[in-house]
Amino acid sequence: MIQRLLEVGVVKFGDFVLSSGLKSPFYIDLRAVLGHPDLFQWVVSQYLSTLSKLEYDVILGVATGGIPYASVLGYLLQRPFGYVRPEAKGHGAGRQIEGAEVAGKRAVVVDDVLTTGKSVLGAISAVGEAGGRVTAVVVFLDREQCGAEAVRRAGAGVYSVYKMRELLEALRPHIGEGQYRSAVEYLSQWRC
């Protein structure tokens, strides 16, 4: 299935600017998985394996990348589910967290990719302000660009299905030595 991530465009190589503003020689678009039910099912099974080792009361997806995964995981695990917006809505109920009640609860935050941790840290802050506590963050991919360290400093455990170097190693036969070395060299600049 790892090779399928490349085939369907989840993993791309080139020159990209990430939502964090960082430049990168590769891009991970886990949203592309949504159009491939077999791949989506496999990704969900990887999340399930990771979540089975954790204790929590509610599952919260980070908008928008974590929402499809967190909703399916909540359904399959029969756990209350919700999602966290980057900021409260300016209309309606004006909520930042929708769905599951978090006050007094242990939450696991689900996102697709972890880079600097900015969006996940925003979710951790929102849950804390609502009276809950994020005990763990689960992502499919940790890009190994200091996000995990930032989340740990905020008091939550970090669990990833893959780390970027692991994914690159698995894809190495399919991407060529040049792209592999370029990506690994790029990652080597991050000292957390």
From Swiss-Prot:
<feature type="binding site">
    <location>
        <position position="91"/>
    </location>
    <ligand>
        <name>5-phospho-alpha-D-ribose 1-diphosphate</name>
    </ligand>
</feature>
<keyword id="KW-0460">Magnesium</keyword>
<comment type="function">
    <text>Catalyzes the transfer of a ribosyl phosphate group from 5-phosphoribose 1-diphosphate to orotate, leading to the formation of orotidine monophosphate (OMP).</text>
</comment>
<dbReference type="InterPro" id="IPR000836">
    <property type="entry name" value="PRibTrfase_dom"/>
</dbReference>
<dbReference type="GO" id="GO:0044205">
    <property type="term" value="P:'de novo' UMP biosynthetic process"/>
</dbReference>
<feature type="binding site">
    <location>
        <position position="143"/>
    </location>
    <ligand>
        <name>orotate</name>
    </ligand>
</feature>
<dbReference type="GO" id="GO:0019856">
    <property type="term" value="P:pyrimidine nucleobase biosynthetic process"/>
</dbReference>
<dbReference type="InterPro" id="IPR029057">
    <property type="entry name" value="PRTase-like"/>
</dbReference>
<feature type="binding site">
    <location>
        <position position="89"/>
    </location>
    <ligand>
        <name>5-phospho-alpha-D-ribose 1-diphosphate</name>
    </ligand>
</feature>
<comment type="similarity">
    <text>Belongs to the purine/pyrimidine phosphoribosyltransferase family. PyrE subfamily.</text>
</comment>
<comment type="subunit">
    <text>Homodimer.</text>
</comment>
<protein>
    <recommendedName>
        <fullName>Orotate phosphoribosyltransferase</fullName>
        <ecNumber>2.4.2.10</ecNumber>
    </recommendedName>
</protein>
<feature type="binding site" description="in other chain">
    <location>
        <begin position="111"/>
        <end position="119"/>
    </location>
    <ligand>
        <name>5-phospho-alpha-D-ribose 1-diphosphate</name>
    </ligand>
</feature>
<dbReference type="Pfam" id="PF00156">
    <property type="entry name" value="Pribosyltran"/>
</dbReference>
<keyword id="KW-0328">Glycosyltransferase</keyword>
<keyword id="KW-0665">Pyrimidine biosynthesis</keyword>
<dbReference type="GO" id="GO:0000287">
    <property type="term" value="F:magnesium ion binding"/>
</dbReference>
<dbReference type="GO" id="GO:0004588">
    <property type="term" value="F:orotate phosphoribosyltransferase activity"/>
</dbReference>
<feature type="binding site">
    <location>
        <position position="115"/>
    </location>
    <ligand>
        <name>orotate</name>
    </ligand>
</feature>
<comment type="pathway">
    <text>Pyrimidine metabolism; UMP biosynthesis via de novo pathway; UMP from orotate: step 1/2.</text>
</comment>
<dbReference type="InterPro" id="IPR004467">
    <property type="entry name" value="Or_phspho_trans_dom"/>
</dbReference>
<feature type="binding site">
    <location>
        <position position="85"/>
    </location>
    <ligand>
        <name>5-phospho-alpha-D-ribose 1-diphosphate</name>
    </ligand>
</feature>
<dbReference type="InterPro" id="IPR023031">
    <property type="entry name" value="OPRT"/>
</dbReference>
<keyword id="KW-0808">Transferase</keyword>
